[in-house]
């Protein structure tokens, strides 16, 4: 038995930790879509579907990104205190509630209002983003930790993150409704929220070598 070949970690993740992998994908899909829509797609959205000039659109996003870099530290500290599950679910609910109001604010093409809208979305995104790395590392045991975290991240980013801008643009072009990116963000958050409600658990505070 001592010479028995170890099972490949990828096979082991799909065999024994499917529920945790699903939870990892759900948490990361909110992050992937939120990150690409809020921090990379919005300058294009603002110049293509509102009357905002490119320089102002980029300025608003730059300000939001700088603020985001500061906000995320506070969200990470809060996550250590209240737990990953609560933070991830709060982010889902916040995106569902705030996405349409924020995109309505973007539609004004007023620089101060656009900055406020982007800051609101950045705070919401930070509630998720500050948790992802820790949540994925904490949910898998040592034997599959790297593989489980990598699979969760890459599946979510390839399927949802990499296509976010394309889907948002396609939905607007198909419907003529400039709020479609908000509806897409809401749908992603709703699906992820349901999955996380039933699959997410808090592992922070448990030594990593004791997670099974």
How does the language model describe each region?
Residues 93-108:
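C-terminal ends and interior cores of transmembrane alpha-helices
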């Amino acid at each position: 038995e001592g010479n028995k070949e170890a099972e490949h970690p990828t096979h082991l993740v799909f065999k024994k930790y499917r529920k945790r992998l699903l939870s990892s994908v759900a948490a990361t899909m909110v992050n992937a879509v939120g990150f690409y829509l809020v921090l990379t797609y919005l300058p294009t959205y603002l110049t293509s579907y509102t009357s905002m000039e490119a320089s102002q659109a980029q300025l608003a996003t730059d300000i939001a990104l700088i603020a985001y870099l500061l906000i995320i530290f506070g969200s990470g500290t809060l996550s250590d205190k209240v737990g990953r599950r609560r933070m991830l679910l709060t982010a889902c609910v916040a995106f569902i509630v705030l996405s349409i109001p924020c995109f309505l604010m973007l539609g004004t093409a007023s620089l101060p209002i656009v900055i406020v809208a982007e800051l609101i979305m950045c705070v919401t995104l930070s509630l998720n983003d500050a948790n992802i790395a820790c949540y994925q590392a904490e949910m898998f045991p040592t034997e599959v930790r790297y593989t489980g975290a990598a699979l969760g991240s890459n599946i979510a980013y390839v399927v949802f993150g990499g296509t976010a801008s394309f889907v948002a643009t396609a939905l607007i072009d198909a419907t003529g409704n400039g709020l479609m990116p908000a509806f897409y963000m809401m749908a992603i958050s709703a699906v992820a929220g349901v999955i996380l409600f039933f699959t997410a658990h808090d592992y922070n505070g448990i030594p990593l070598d004791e997670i099974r």
